[in-house]
Amino acid sequence: MNPGLLKLAVVGSRSAYGRLAGIAGGVAVGVCLLLLLWGGANGLSARDDRGAWLRETGMSSVSVPVAAGDPSASGPATPVPLTADTVLMETNPVEVFRDQLINRRNFAALSTTTVQIPGIGNPPAPGQYYASPALQRLIESTPRDQLGDRFGQFAGTIDDAALPGPDSLIVITGATESELRQGGRASLVSGFTTNPYGGSAAAYSTVLLIGAIAVFFPVLLLISIVTGLGAAQRRERFATLRLIGASPQTVSRIAAVETAVPSLIGAIFGVVLATLLRPATAQIPVNGTRMFTADLATGWLAAAAVVGLVVTASALVAGYRTARAGIGVTRSVHEKTPTVWRIVPLLTGLVAMMMAVGITRIPQLRSPLLELPLLVGGFALILAGIVVIGPWLTRLTSRIGLRQARSAAAVIAASRIQRTPVATFRSVSGLVVAVFVVSVFAGASSIIQSTEAPPARPGLLQPTSLHATVGAGHTPAQVSEAMRQAKELPGVRNATIGYGAAALSEGNAGPKTYFRAADAPGLGFEEIPRTEIVAVDSSFLRLWTEQPLPLTPAPVDSLNGLVPVVVVVGTDGTPEAMDRARTLLNSSGVTAHPATSSLDNELQSPTRLVQGLAVLAYLGMFVAIAIAGMSLAVSTASAVLDRKRVLGLMRLMGMPVSVLRRIISREAAVPLLTVLLLSIGLGFFVAWLMVTGINDTYRMTWPAPDYFAALALSLLLALSAVIATFSLLRGHTALAATRFE
């Protein structure tokens, strides 16, 4: 390749250097986003792997033999003894402080145990605890009677290797074997699982893959757009080289090198930029915790692969486009008219996703090997199909607009759109894809419904109260002493003991719980029978009970012969009072289960998997919209630069700049509005297909206000991108610039 021809093609004016700088800058932004998103995906996977041990459930700690002579009956349960290769573990699912859920694991082990606990090694001694750094900081900054007294004596911190993130709240406590067995919820553990998702692995993988495609696609679109900057000027120079004797192969190689060099510079700068932004990106909380900075590292091999792929693809596309150009082409290129066949990719993608949903309805056909490719592949086809069908719809709209045009700006804009629908739609394709992606994210995250606490009304547990079941074997005197201490706490209004025939964990507990009638008002009841002892159905204590339950006269005249089965502590509802009461109950030694409130139900919603991805959804919205805004600004500016000769001649003939502005605005508005409603509708339909394909029990609702804010931001970015080109329009269509052309 002749170096002189390369210099002639590349060097020449300030605009040429500006175009190369624009390509480098756009590629830098694209590569930076690609690496950060790649690192984020790797970080989420690494974070989930570190926290996988928290999913360990172990095996039963009791043995229930089959009764002799009756296979359907069972004998009394007997404890399975501890051995050196097992530990006794109790999972506390409702250890709550304020509105935060603390992962607590209680362990009891023999002194000769060989089981290693992730993050600490040997199990803690009874009365000691290990905490994550974030939880220990919280304990040290909080009065002990609100949090610290629940756990015992601090023994050390949990290593980062066992923590999902730096904000994780995890505590590992030591207890005696008798304490854990008495609670009835302990299990034997000989090792810890490394599967972070359990039965939700396929659903989690599907969501992450679709999310990655949804966010990566706009980034690739941005890179594609910026590498086409100044296409008209390039075509003119390359056509000149062809006319003076350069072979098509030579010109194609020149075009490839011209694009590859700034792309390489931009890609390298993008790698550096991603490295510098990594600490700031790690501060974004996902599912309640940030990521460690090291989680976002992709490694130099991955960075080199991204740089190589971006530069190679940019160079090959530039060379291919130049090789296809005619020898006499200078400014305008006649596009091939889009046909109705462009609808095929979109329809194929929709059919694939609908087939995946149909398979989930047929138990005999359900298989991740079928569902995952159909959902992910269908989504990718729909995403590409929107970009493919856009020019065809834009051309149809422009034909209608041309018939209805009543001004010069409308006629010129509609005529150009009809001649070049592909180039016109390309300028807004990023924003159209962003609206689709935002609609998908908003629709999918609309199933995230907070499980609100029931309102404070008679017949239901009050939201400001805490209750805990009493362990078997505790005397009324022990429970009464714990309630006496609870009444002395600041913010506690009452403390009530419920009685029954046996502890609620035992088979002969009975369906009713008994209270003193004098204590009933403290439980929120208004209609109280005129007896000394009253009864209520035991479902009164369940968090999911929504219908008020009535009090009835008890069939007994006194509590003699009954045992304490539950304690209920009423507070003034302040966080401090709730946490004091919770700490006292959990450390009293008489409760079989941790104290809980109906307000805690929100923290244990069954849709926690999707809740954890909500932040990713809104982050994806922001990334898609930001990239789309940049793409539209670059495309609109590029369109002005490519047509500055034509627009300049219009001004030279007397057309006001205001008319030129209206032309540019219409050329951006028509394709955007043409496909906007389609993108919104498809986005919510695809979200519904995804949601029902992952779990057919999920239901979508109206999107959050954030979605409408995102749509408004998209339109605002579109308006800003068009307005930003107005100054460019005036400068490059001035009389002096036109004479130079």
What are these regions (language model features)?
Residues A16-L44, A202-R234, S252, T259-L273, ...:
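Hydrophobic alpha-helical transmembrane segments of multi-pass inner-membrane transport and secretion
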Residues M1-P218, P458-L460, P555-Y618:
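Membrane transport/envelope proteins' first extracytoplasmic loop
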Residues M1-C32, T339-P345, A352, W392-V435, ...:
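N-terminal Sec/SRP start-transfer signal
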Residues I389-F540:
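Juxtamembrane segments of multi-pass membrane proteins
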Residues V271-G299, L365-P373, I680-S714, I723-R739:
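Short helix-loop junctions at transmembrane helix boundaries
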Residues L301-E335, T360, L713-E741:
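C-terminal membrane-exit region of the final transmembrane helix in multipass inner-membrane proteins
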Residues V29-S74, R278, A282-V286, I359-L369, ...:
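Alpha-helical transmembrane segments
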